[in-house]
């Protein structure tokens, strides 16, 4: 009975340890995602954008500086 109790304690402690490691991994990944959102926000606030005004597929004028300074943004071409 004593051996069974010890075996169960070891099993549950290893499960708890693996969950703790998994939770720590999730915590580490979150700041990277937040940082990328902040960078996009900074890019969208940049007033010295090299992009000229473009027209979307509906003929609406797009000021690319209002969207972002990333050339991958929709409608923004150099």
Swiss-Prot record:
Q: Where in the cell is it found?
A: Secreted
Cellular component (GO) terms are: extracellular space
Which residues lie in the propeptide? Answer: 19-61
Extract the GO molecular function terms from the UniProt entry.
toxin activity
Record's signal peptide:
1-18
Q: Name the InterPro entries on file.
A: Heat-stable_enterotox_CS, Heat-stable_enterotox_STa
- Pfam families assigned to the protein according to its UniProt record, in alphabetical order: Enterotoxin_ST (PF02048)
**Disulphide bridges, residue numbers:** 64-69, 65-73, 68-76
Q: Which UniProt keywords apply?
A: Disulfide bond, Enterotoxin, Secreted, Signal, Toxin, Virulence
Q: Which family does it belong to?
A: Belongs to the heat-stable enterotoxin family.
Could you tell me what this protein is called?
Heat-stable enterotoxin STO
Upper lineage is: Bacteria, Pseudomonadati, Pseudomonadota, Gammaproteobacteria, Vibrionales
Q: Please name the gene that encodes this protein.
A: sto
